[in-house]
């Protein structure tokens, strides 16, 4: 067998092993853990998910109202739409979605994508929006009373 065919076969075998390992890693789903009880100074209600699965993994929780960073705005959510992407995030499928949301468990517990609301706070670098502005946007887990959004994307 020629050397180039041996190298090609080795490269194909390595590629298959890599793809198989990635598939097994992405398919891993960690069990849901109980929430950690801690003191909350600025509470808000939110729908969250701590693990991948069906609607049974969604729970109403009381969490901290987030503080906007310099480039963010805090929006009081007036409406949040259910988007097909939310279903994929919640289930973690197709497994390639887990590269964005977290392998084993979600990195961000907030769920939801589309929202509309009123600006409550603005970060120090934000000049495009002011408190009281009506805005809409996507991302960040808006199935909650408040959501953070990047000012440049809203």
Residue ranges and their predicted role:
Residues 139-151:
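A structural motif shared across PLP-dependent enzymes of the aminotransferase-like
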Residues 3-33:
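Terminal signal-anchor or tail-anchor transmembrane helices
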Residues 78-79, 152-154:
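Extended, non-globular alpha-helical segments
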Residues 85-91:
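Cytochrome P450 core scaffold surrounding the K-helix E-X-X-R motif
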Residues 54-58, 84:
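Short N-terminal binding/cap micro-motifs at the start of the first secondary-structure element
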Residues 30-44, 62-68:
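N-terminal signal-anchor transmembrane helix
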Residues 65-81, 94-141:
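Glycine-rich beta-strand-centered segment in the early N-terminal region that forms part
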